[in-house]
């Protein structure tokens, strides 16, 4: 299954690869092989990148699931942006080989969707969470607020987010993607018990990040 978030990119890539194959008809044989081979590999990688497998969200209450596929690269204490109360930041690195469709981490009401322009530092550079282009999102489940950010990277410069303020969403629902790698940062209130460790591989909509 392919994600609809990548339709335009898939169409453009397909047309480009077809053009390369046409050009290959008018060049020497060895060059033909290389160009057609490159076109096929490029198209297959694009289709692979925009895959969107089904996910089964745990049938449990009082959980927060991962909004992204990838590896937990940092768990660190922080403070909630508005109140200054203690919180925990969980940072997930998404490589180009991970599934890039993002999913809602907790059921609730969207209280904020804010685009922040910025730089395009490498995603594994922790300065990127504050200085890179990103989409900041807040969800209120009636007990507390969870914040998370889709962060652009050096390669990933296209954020897709379909959430709007006042949307009521359910845990595990698709809401967007970051094209071609990057990171997602979550800020969990201190009342949430973190259930992952640095270095853990996580899957969007399935891996339990925290319990409350």
UniProtKB/Swiss-Prot annotation:
Quote the record's cofactor note. Answer: Binds 1 pyruvoyl group covalently per subunit.
Chief subcellular location equals membrane
One Gene Ontology BP term is:
phosphatidylethanolamine biosynthetic process
Tell me the cofactors it needs.
pyruvate
Catalytic reaction list: a 1,2-diacyl-sn-glycero-3-phospho-L-serine + H(+) = a 1,2-diacyl-sn-glycero-3-phosphoethanolamine + CO2
Its post-translational modification remark reads: Is synthesized initially as an inactive proenzyme. Formation of the active enzyme involves a self-maturation process in which the active site pyruvoyl group is generated from an internal serine residue via an autocatalytic post-translational modification. Two non-identical subunits are generated from the proenzyme in this reaction, and the pyruvate is formed at the N-terminus of the alpha chain, which is derived from the carboxyl end of the proenzyme.
Pfam families (alphabetical): PS_Dcarbxylase
Tell me where in this chain the PTM Pyruvic acid (Ser) is found: 182
Residues with site note (Cleavage (non-hydrolytic)): 181-182
Where's the active site on this chain?
182
Q: Which HAMAP family is this protein grouped with? A: PS_decarb_PSD_A
Name assigned to this protein: Phosphatidylserine decarboxylase proenzyme
Naturally occurring in which organism (per UniProt): Chlorobium chlorochromatii (strain CaD3)
Q: Upper lineage ranks? A: Bacteria, Pseudomonadati, Chlorobiota, Chlorobiia, Chlorobiales
């Amino acid at each position: 299954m392919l994600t609809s978030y990548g339709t335009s990119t898939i169409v453009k890539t397909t047309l480009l690869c077809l053009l390369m194959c046409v050009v290959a008809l008018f060049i020497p044989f060895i060059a033909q092989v290389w160009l057609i081979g490159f076109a096929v590999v490029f198209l297959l990688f694009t289709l692979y990148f925009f895959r969107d497998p089904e996910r089964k969200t745990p049938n449990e209450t009082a959980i927060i699931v991962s909004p992204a596929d990838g590896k937990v690269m940092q768990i660190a204490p922080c403070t909630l942006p508005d109140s200054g109360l203690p919180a925990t930041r969980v940072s997930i690195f998404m490589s180009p080989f991970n599934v890039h469709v993002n999913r809602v981490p907790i059921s609730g009401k969207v209280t904020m969707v804010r685009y922040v322009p910025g730089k395009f530092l490498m995603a594994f550079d922790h300065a990127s969470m504050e200085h890179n282009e990103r989409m900041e999102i807040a969800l209120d489940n009636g007990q507390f607020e969870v914040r998370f950010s889709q962060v652009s990277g050096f390669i990933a410069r296209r954020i897709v987010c379909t959430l709007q303020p006042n949307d009521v969403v359910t845990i595990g629902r698709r809401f967007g993607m970051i094209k071609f790698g990057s990171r997602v940062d979550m800020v969990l209130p201190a009342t949430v018990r973190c259930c992952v460790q640095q270095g853990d591989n996580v899957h969007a909509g399935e891996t339990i990040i925290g319990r409350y």
